[in-house]
């Protein structure tokens, strides 16, 4: 395959260490703009510009399109570092970057249409559930639907939308992922939320639009072996790792960074505080030390846990292996349990802020809101994600068309 003629910035020479350094360098800048993102209910232009200039939307985009094509552990690490500055920024980058990796499943024609003129082009999504409905027409499908939680849609020229294809009798005959240009969908300004406001995760809709076959990829019934045309174009085993089993790890990265920010801010606050009556240093209280220690241990444990999942999966695919059902369910279990521990850590730290933490201008208040809002994501539901792994461990059988 010939490399496309890339006119925007080319980040193919940026390695893992440099990419992580770029993300780390943005932390102070992101903290300065976090409140602005929160109020705008989307990333402000200055933040989007900085991310583009540093190539941080493109850390797992193929090198042939000017992306960094980093190892899969970056799937967690880059959002984690950005999340230390602002959870919403880390979350949006995690989502939009993951769609760069996902586009590699589509045929070359689709990749050329989206990235041919501008590899910086971003793709948002409505894929958590197949909320669209489609019928077969000549050359493609006719798609109608309404998809919620499309993070970063304000900055994206395309949408990746999931749908169920039905026959004339209404019977499901396929499940497809569709790449849809901005001109064919409508964004509803409905993102008024408790937290994660800066993600701008709005609802998108479309009515009876035509999606050609080359942009409507079969994910299940018509493609039981999950043999995707785009994988023939990209040799890196990272692109073969199934998103369904590790999809939550990138956004969990952002929220691990958010919890780390809570730890850092609380630690700095404790070093400076003393009691009003006795002047005793807050840092000398053993109860305070215990809380800091417990929160830090939980955050470090989750970081190690989820990074190890990413490393393990990539190492397996490097040698031509594939994930077992047990491994896929274990990764999903780890992601959900990890978020539970992160919420506990942030709660512990927020309690230490006392009355000062309840003000709108308190970074800890936003961090607290963001952590709890993010925990509502289906990937982090312990009820949904822990029991399937246990079911298999106990000798049961777990079936899912999308896993």
Regions found by a protein language model. Name each.
Residues 43-53, 57-157, 171-173:
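Glycine-rich flavin
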Residues 355-403:
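Glycine-rich phosphate/cofactor-binding loops in nucleotide/flavin-utilizing enzymes
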Residues 344-351, 382-386:
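Short segments within alpha-helical structural elements
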Residues 146-185, 189-190:
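DPxDG-like acidic metal-binding loop motif
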Residues 24, 257, 293-300, 332, ...:
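Generic structural signal for well-ordered, non-transmembrane alpha-helical segments
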Residues 31, 35-38, 301-337, 350-358:
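C-terminal helix-coil-helix/basic helical segment that borders enzyme active sites and/or dimer interfaces
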Residues 194-195, 201-299:
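Glycine-rich beta->alpha junctions and the first turn(s) of the following alpha-helix
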Residues 1-21, 25, 402-403:
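Basic/polar N-terminal segments that are highly enriched at the extreme N-terminus
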């Amino acid at each position: 395959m010939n490399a496309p003629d890339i006119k925007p910035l080319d980040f193919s020479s940026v390695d893992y260490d440099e990419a992580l350094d770029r993300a780390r360098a943005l932390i102070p800048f992101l903290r300065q703009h976090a409140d602005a993102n929160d109020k705008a209910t989307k990333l402000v232009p200055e933040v989007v510009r900085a991310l583009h200039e540093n190539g941080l939307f493109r850390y797992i985009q193929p090198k042939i399109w000017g992306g960094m094509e980093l190892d899969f552990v970056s799937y967690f690490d880059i959002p984690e570092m950005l999340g230390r500055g602002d959870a919403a920024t880390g979350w949006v980058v995690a989502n939009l970057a993951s769609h760069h990796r996902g586009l590699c499943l589509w045929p070359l024609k689709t990749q050329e249409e989206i990235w041919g003129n501008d590899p910086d082009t971003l793709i948002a999504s409505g894929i958590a559930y197949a909320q669209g409905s489609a019928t077969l027409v000549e050359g493609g499908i006719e798609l109608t639907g309404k998809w919620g939680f499309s993070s970063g849609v304000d900055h994206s020229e395309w949408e990746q939308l999931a749908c169920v294809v039905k026959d004339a009798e209404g019977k499901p005959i396929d499940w497809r992922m569709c790449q849809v240009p901005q001109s064919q969908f409508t964004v509803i300004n409905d993102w008024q939320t408790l937290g994660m406001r800066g993600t701008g995760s709005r609802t998108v809709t479309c009515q009876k639009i035509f999606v050609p076959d080359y942009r409507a990829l079969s994910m299940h019934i018509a493609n039981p072996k999950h043999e995707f045309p785009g994988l023939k174009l990209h040799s890196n085993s990272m692109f073969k790792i199934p998103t369904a089993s590790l999809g939550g790890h990138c956004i969990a990265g952002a929220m691990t960074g958010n919890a780390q920010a809570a730890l850092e801010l609380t630690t700095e606050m404790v070093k400076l505080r003393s009691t009003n009556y006795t002047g005793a240093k807050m840092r000398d209280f053993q109860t305070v030390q215990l809380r800091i220690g417990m929160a830090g241990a939980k955050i470090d444990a989750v970081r190690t846990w989820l990074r190890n999942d990413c490393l393990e999966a990539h190492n397996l695919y490097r040698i031509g292996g594939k994930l077992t059902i047990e491994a896929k369910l274990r990764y999903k279990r780890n992601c959900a349990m990890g978020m539970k521990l992160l919420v506990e850590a942030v709660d512990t730290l927020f309690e230490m802020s006392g009355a000062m933490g309840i003000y709108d201008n308190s970074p800890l208040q936003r961090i607290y809101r963001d952590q709890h809002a993010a925990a509502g994501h289906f990937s982090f539901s312990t009820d949904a994600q822990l029991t399937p792994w246990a079911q298999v461990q106990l000798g049961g059988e777990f079936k899912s068309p999308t896993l």
